[in-house]
Amino acid sequence: MKINYQSLEKKIDLKFKNKDLLVQALTHKSFNPNENYEKIEFLGDRVLGLVIAKKLLEIYPEEKEGILDKKFASLVNKKTCLDIAKKINLASYVKTFNPNNKKIKIEDKIISDSCEALIGAIYPVSYTHLTLPTILLV
């Protein structure tokens, strides 16, 4: 089954020069134990945290740190990533090992992790601006 990554690029309004990075960001370790999204997900989690922290400081410049921390925690979590991933139907782009080659439902954790990995893959494209495509922001 061939995956149309161009349709994902269109959804997030971002064109990847390095398609291999995009493919790796959407590859689960069950499909490829060596080139998968785990390290890119690690980066994506940090990028997401930094972008959200920066945005919260812009929106609430006078707010106390404790309140900002609560707002941050409500935004940077697996459920938020899952909601974003569902909004762009990210599961349809994720490669997982499927021994029977049948359509299967991908676990929510894999979808959420893939969203963080996608954010990690976006970082090299937009790191000078520390922004994410609007579709990925809640």
What are the residue ranges of the model-derived segments?
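Single conserved hydrophobic/aromatic residue that forms the stacking wall/gate
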Residues: H129-V138
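RNase III-family endoribonuclease catalytic core
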Residues: M1-L130
